[in-house]
């Protein structure tokens, strides 16, 4: 496949959870993260996404470096440092918080808690969307949003808002995740996962449905549902041998 988008982000845990911009994931069937040292990680699951603020939470395979996430709101007139990523020449740019607004989002994967949204005095370079703003203690405070032209100001959404997102496969949140063919994180409860599997079949994208089926099989390899569903998909596409292999697993 071809590259459809790039962005920045940060790891928010040592076990592979990360936050970034949502737009590059839309229409993607695969994503790879490259950290500041040049190490690559495959994205193996989407957790949640918010298309209003254009952010998402996802998971990569393997252990990861992590940035501490600020739990408090940074007051106006404070200094924040924009960490501009580059494997060759990373740099920090100074910014001043000119205004702090608050927002809350109640819905699938989101708690309804109030979070800060920052307006900053800073001349932002190009191609730094979703780079983190950090405080003097090194905590990740916010993710910078894309800027058009040289305005001298920029907006940034709370890292904690994105980090707090929970796994979602039902409701509007599921519809948003269905815009990507990267598999969502399957619910740990088998009954919930069965519901998610059925609902995924009603989504518009067959690629998304196929990715959900694969995620279900990985999460519940001893259950027959996933193999039976994949067998039907393979048979519909003319893969008789593959369908037969799946049905053999299902009845074993």
Predicted regions and their residues:
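Conserved active-site neighborhood of the chymotrypsin/trypsin-like protease fold
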Residues: 13-92, 117-123
């Amino acid at each position: 496949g071809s590259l459809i988008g790039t962005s920045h982000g940060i790891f928010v845990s040592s076990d592979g959870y990360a936050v970034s911009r949502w737009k590059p994931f839309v229409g993607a069937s695969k994503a790879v993260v490259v950290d500041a040292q040049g190490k690559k990680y495959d994205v193996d699951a989407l957790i949640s996404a918010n298309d209003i603020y254009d952010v998402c939470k996802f998971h990569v395979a393997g252990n990861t470096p992590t940035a501490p996430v600020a739990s408090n709101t940074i007051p106006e007139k404070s200094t924040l440092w924009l960490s501009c990523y580059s494997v060759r020449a990373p740099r920090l740019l100074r910014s001043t918080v000119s205004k702090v607004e608050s927002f809350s989002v109640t819905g699938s994967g989101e708690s309804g808690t109030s979070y800060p949204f920052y307006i900053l005095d800073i001349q932002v370079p190009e191609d730094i969307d979703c780079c983190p703003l950090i405080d003097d203690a090194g905590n990740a405070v916010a993710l910078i949003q894309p800027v058009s032209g040289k305005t001298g100001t920029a907006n940034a959404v709370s890292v904690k808002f994105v980090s707090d997102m929970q796994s979602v496969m039902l409701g509007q949140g599921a519809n948003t995740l269905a815009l990507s063919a990267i598999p969502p994180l399957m619910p740990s409860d088998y009954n919930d996962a069965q519901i998610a599997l059925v609902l995924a079949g009603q989504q518009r994208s067959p690629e998304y449905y196929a990715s959900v089926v694969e995620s279900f099989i990985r999460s519940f390899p001893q259950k027959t549902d996933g193999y039976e569903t994949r067998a039907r998909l393979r048979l519909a596409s003319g893969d008789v041998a593959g369908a037969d292999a799946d049905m053999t697993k299902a009845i074993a």
